[in-house]
């Protein structure tokens, strides 16, 4: 009897592996595959919990629920379609496998579907032709505003213009020589007024003394 049970389990396991189809649970069970209940997930239930039962609260270090599990909300209500989003990798919708057996639990790659495949879109946004415009190397640079020929264009050369050729500093104003003008040549100090000889005049020689 025991050998028969072992063989039956082996045959069942081989069939599941070959067909990649999970074992259909009992009609009163809820089932979710490959859920990571990290530390902080308040409730993580094993597959033996039935609908309406209360889940066991798990605390402490992270718990890897790699087998078929059910994540419950705080009040333990596991009925579909409630969402379990308590610190798990992805929000999880409870599946009533008795009513809707639509998930292939052996195929987790359905969560890795490329966005392009999901959209059925062939635009390939990652390699779009937007880059061909190449705004960074556009011909704006050929105008070369920085080296425009404003300076050598007119050669006005304001700094060396002929304004300075008038030579205001050395103009001929100084040649009049006001300091050495001929005013001094009149020689007022040595004028001939003194030569009139008033002191030596002949007033004393009029001959008044000759009356005696």
Swiss-Prot record:
It comes from the Eukaryota. Residues 117-180 have a biased composition (Basic and acidic residues). The keyword Secreted applies. It is found in: Secreted. GO terms for cellular component: extracellular region. Residues 108-180 are annotated as: Disordered. This is Uncharacterized secreted protein ARB_06108. Sequence repeats lie at residues 123-127, 128-132, 133-137, 138-142, 143-147, 148-152, 166-170, 171-175, 176-180, 181-185, 186-190, 191-195, 196-200, 201-205, 206-210. Residues 120-210 are annotated as: 15 X 5 AA tandem repeats of K-D-Y-G-H. Keywords: Repeat, Secreted, Signal. Residues 1-18 form the signal peptide. The keyword rRNA processing does not apply.
